[in-house]
């Protein structure tokens, strides 16, 4: 049993929680299901460390991510979007104590994701006024600059892992393609089956807003196209587009932002499969795909 989990169990009694059970684990957080004082199921999101690092992102501020999750969930719930209700945010006073977010636990019936319904939900999300916050993933700069800089950073990181890796795309070319990018919408940027709770295939909650940015729908679609290459994400991009088009215009494939956002996503996935969750088949193939996208630009 880890020291942080032992500390969590101690705190759980103080918060009136019982029956902690691990239900998910990622790079920065573990998620437990528990029962609250009122008998309702609760999701307990626990940061592994105060600051974390991985191949894609250095010095991840997990406290800032928990605060962002809390604020975004409350903002979207107030606008009628299906999210896991954020109940309480506990920020530790001591380094030994974990930061924890308590949310409503939203079950999934295992029926699979209806991509058409997901498209309709994403159109609703992108029309909601964005929350008054600076997303953690923006690193305190504009979305266009954040994407340009992380493409360069991740490209260089892959170059230390892959032989004969070429020079990166010119940063001015990337910035030029993002010149028209607005920040009028909240985009999730991690939409896949693991982060969508469903009932009879229909999305009933969007989870995990760690990657969120303020941007335009083209950012979301660039990420969706790349995620859809992996069947476990359960994404049918054409069905998503059809559902989205019921209430909002779908970004065209000719949108210059979309090609950049595809490259941004492809580089992230290449690093995932090269070193975060190493896969001897997917890693090199993902790096080759990212290189091809860059050459098209």
Stretch-by-stretch model annotation:
Residues 219-250, 263-279:
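Active-site activation/catalytic loop segments of kinase-like enzymes and analogous catalytic loops
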Residues 3-18, 114, 128-189, 288-294:
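An alpha-helical support segment within catalytic cores of ATP-dependent transferases
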Residues 21-25:
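Protein kinase glycine-rich loop
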Residues 29-35, 43-44, 173-219:
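Active-site acidic catalytic loop and adjacent metal/ATP-binding pocket
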Residues 80, 90, 126-133, 178, ...:
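A general structural signal marking secondary-structure boundaries and capping sites
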Residues 134-136, 274-289:
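Hydrophobic/aromatic-rich alpha-helical bundle segments in the mid-to-C-terminal region
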Residues 27-140:
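ATP-binding pocket architecture of kinase catalytic cores
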């Amino acid at each position: 049993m880890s020291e942080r989990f032992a500390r969590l169990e101690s705190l759980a009694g103080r918060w009136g929680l019982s029956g902690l059970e691990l239900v998910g684990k990622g790079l920065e957080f573990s998620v437990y299901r528990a029962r609250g004082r009122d008998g309702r199921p609760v999701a307990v999101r626990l940061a592994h460390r105060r600051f974390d690092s991985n191949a894609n992102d250095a010095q991840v501020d997990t406290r800032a991510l928990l605060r962002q999750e809390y604020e975004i969930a409350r903002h979207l719930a107030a606008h009628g979007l299906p999210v896991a209700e954020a109940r309480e945010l506990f920020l530790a006073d001591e380094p030994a104590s974990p930061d924890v977010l308590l949310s409503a636990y939203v079950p999934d019936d295992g029926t699979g994701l209806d991509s058409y319904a997901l498209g309709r939900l994403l159109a609703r999300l992108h029309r909601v006024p964005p929350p008054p916050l600076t997303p953690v993933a923006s690193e305190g700069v504009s979305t266009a600059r954040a994407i340009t800089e992380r493409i360069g950073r991740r490209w260089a990181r892959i170059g230390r892992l892959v032989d004969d890796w070429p020079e990166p795309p010119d940063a001015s070319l990337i910035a030029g393609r993002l010149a028209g990018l607005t920040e009028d919408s909240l985009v999730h940027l991690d939409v896949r089956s693991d982060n969508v709770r469903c009932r009879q295939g229909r999305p009933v909650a969007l989870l995990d807003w760690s990657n969120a940015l303020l941007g335009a729908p083209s950012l979301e679609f660039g990420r969706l196209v790349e995620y859809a290459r992996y069947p476990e994400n359960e994404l049918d991009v054409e069905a998503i587009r059809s559902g989205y088009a019921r209430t909002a215009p779908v970004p065209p494939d000719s949108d210059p932002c979309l090609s950049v956002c595809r490259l941004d996503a492809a580089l992230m996935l290449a690093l995932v499969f090269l070193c975060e969750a190493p896969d001897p088949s997917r890693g090199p193939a993902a790096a080759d795909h990212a290189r091809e996208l860059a050459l098209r630009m």
